[in-house]
């Protein structure tokens, strides 16, 4: 009787371990990066849109490198979005009151990607709060566009260049 219980428990442990391993094989991260520039002419304490260039995805290659294809992708979520100040070197995020970043493609509606309100940071980088929107159609597209809206808490004396690092968690079926 004890042998049967031990075998049953061992089988459950092996099965759970195998499921976790399969899930790991089907989940991977796609990283994208872009830069935005907040110009010194930006008005103080009013929301301002910051232009961003289109971001070309390398999704077909990324999917292929991870043993899948675009049509096998089940879901994509933003797992991390970090902003870091590139220049000026001595600048921190103390000038920033709030930031909201939106994503869209030519064929898809715009959705909010991440945000941070009441920014209170003397650091050179900040993690934004994520909206947990499903982003499959944006990452599968050839390119997507970000729209950034910022509100500053002080007047800027020089342009501030910010690097936007994004990590997307992709879950897909294998080939």
Regions found by a protein language model. Give the residues of each.
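Short coil-to-beta strand junction motifs in C2/discoidin
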Residues: 76, 92-99
């Amino acid at each position: 009787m004890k042998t049967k219980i031990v075998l049953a428990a061992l089988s459950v442990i092996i099965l759970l371990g195998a499921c976790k391993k399969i899930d790991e094989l089907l989940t991977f991260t796609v990283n994208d990066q872009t830069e935005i520039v907040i110009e010194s002419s930006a008005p103080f304490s009013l929301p301002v849109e910051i232009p961003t260039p289109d971001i070309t995805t390398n999704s077909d290659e990324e999917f292929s490198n991870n043993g899948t294809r675009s049509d096998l992708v089940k879901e994509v979520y933003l797992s991390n979005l970090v902003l870091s100040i590139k220049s000026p070197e001595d600048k921190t995020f103390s000038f920033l009151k709030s930031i909201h970043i939106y994503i869209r493609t030519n064929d898809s509606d715009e959705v909010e990607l991440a945000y941070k309100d009441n920014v209170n940071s003397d650091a050179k980088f900040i993690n934004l709060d994520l909206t947990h929107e499903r982003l499959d159609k944006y990452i599968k597209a050839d390119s997507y566009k970000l729209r950034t809206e910022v509100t500053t808490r002080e007047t800027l004396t020089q342009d501030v260049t910010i690097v936007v690092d994004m990590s997307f968690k992709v879950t897909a079926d294998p080939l």
